[in-house]
């Protein structure tokens, strides 16, 4: 599953489209929500987690992009990323019941949350998309 973002009125063809798979998008959008909780509505934040064609207008989009870029230079991103990675390291294994024929076994596996990735390069690409998209639709 992935998230396709379509620019409303891009400055150029380069900024017409942005895509992320779920493992990268969820941490990215959570970071955006934290940086932008004073400008995004609860509905904006919630809808960012779904492919419901929700639109973030140009004004908000530009602010989001600028805040992301600023967070790289003032260590907000670094601090958030360090905390994110530390939390992932601390996750316990998860137990699952496995039924096959007459055996009921329990297996342990790494938490699926460890698959989430907060990637600075992707976040920078998203920030530039936001600034130049004219607003965007999350599909």
Annotated model-derived regions:
Residues 1-139:
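Acidic (Asp/Glu-rich) sequence patches and key acidic residues
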């Amino acid at each position: 599953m992935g998230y396709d973002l379509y620019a409303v009125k891009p400055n150029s063809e380069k900024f017409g489209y942005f895509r992320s798979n779920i493992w990268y998008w969820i941490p990215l959008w959570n970071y955006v929500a934290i940086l932008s909780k004073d400008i995004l509505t609860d509905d904006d934040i919630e809808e960012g987690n779904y492919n419901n064609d929700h639109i973030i207008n140009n004004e908000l989009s530009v602010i989001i992009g600028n805040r992301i870029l600023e967070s790289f230079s003032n260590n907000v991103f670094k601090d958030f990323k360090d905390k994110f990675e530390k939390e992932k390291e601390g996750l316990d294994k998860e137990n699952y019941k496995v039924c096959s024929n007459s055996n009921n076994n329990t297996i342990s596996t790494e938490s699926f949350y460890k698959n989430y990735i907060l990637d600075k390069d992707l976040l920078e690409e998203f920030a530039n998309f936001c600034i130049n998209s004219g607003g965007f639709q999350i599909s």
